[in-house]
């Protein structure tokens, strides 16, 4: 695999910024967004102006984990109205959502998880967006066939409501592409897709390039791009082959940066990571 060095990146950044016709431009546009939690503004509408000022093309918002009157923090008409107003004002889309409450009540076995997913489907529709990320991590990570089957069965019922709302349920986890497809098939719904995280897959020992090409655009709803705790391009993940694979499957939509800020200078680090990935896209 070809690796982009930082020297090469810095030397070509200006040219990439001026480039108006990359290979990605020949297909429907891949847009680069950012997660609100990596802006340290989880479940906070102020993530939208910050992301816009940093140059991102969308924001993936989380609904929050610390309940307010028994509901997720974003489950409030005034909060939803604020999100929509800021999205219009700063001309930046809400590109997707995340039911991060599943970190507390996981869908692999906790009956309470269904409530948070159903509420999040409703909120996702209210925010006029389509992709709802369902995380399976920590003690809620999928590890056994029984757990995967339980998740698939739970998704079968939840997907009915997602389909009615025009919402896609995106599975983000640490299992293989093949196991994710088995869950999708068990759900019996085209509204259940893979939310592909290149960092999680690499750490779990899978080959992102191979998996992205095998899954194809029809089974992936969005991407997370990261190589934490490093800057993009300075860790072990080689992004040029990954971005070429995304291009080659003709994926269009959003890839959200879920990248850390290694220097703790949040805005500078976010700009640096965004510039890097756009440079890679220009070379793809």
Q: What are these model-derived regions, one by one?
A:
Residues 2-19, 24-31, 40-54, 177-284:
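Histidine-acidic metal/acid-base catalytic patches
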Residues 62-82, 138-143:
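Glycine-rich, proline-tolerant flexible connector loops at the mouths of alpha/beta enzymes
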Residues 14-18, 46-48, 52, 86-96, ...:
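Active-site acidic/histidine proton-transfer and metal-coordination neighborhood
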Residues 30-35, 59-61, 94-99, 132-134, ...:
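Hydrophobic faces of well-ordered beta-strands that scaffold small-molecule active sites
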Residues 74-80, 110-118, 147-155, 207-213, ...:
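Charged helix-capping and loop-helix junction motifs
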Residues 34-35, 68-71, 104-108, 144-146, ...:
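Short, contiguous strand/loop micro-motifs
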Residues 67-74, 91-99, 130-135, 168-172, ...:
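Low-complexity, flexible helical/coil segments
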Residues 38, 63-65, 100-103, 136-140, ...:
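Active-site-proximal loop/turn and secondary-structure-junction residues that shape catalytic pockets
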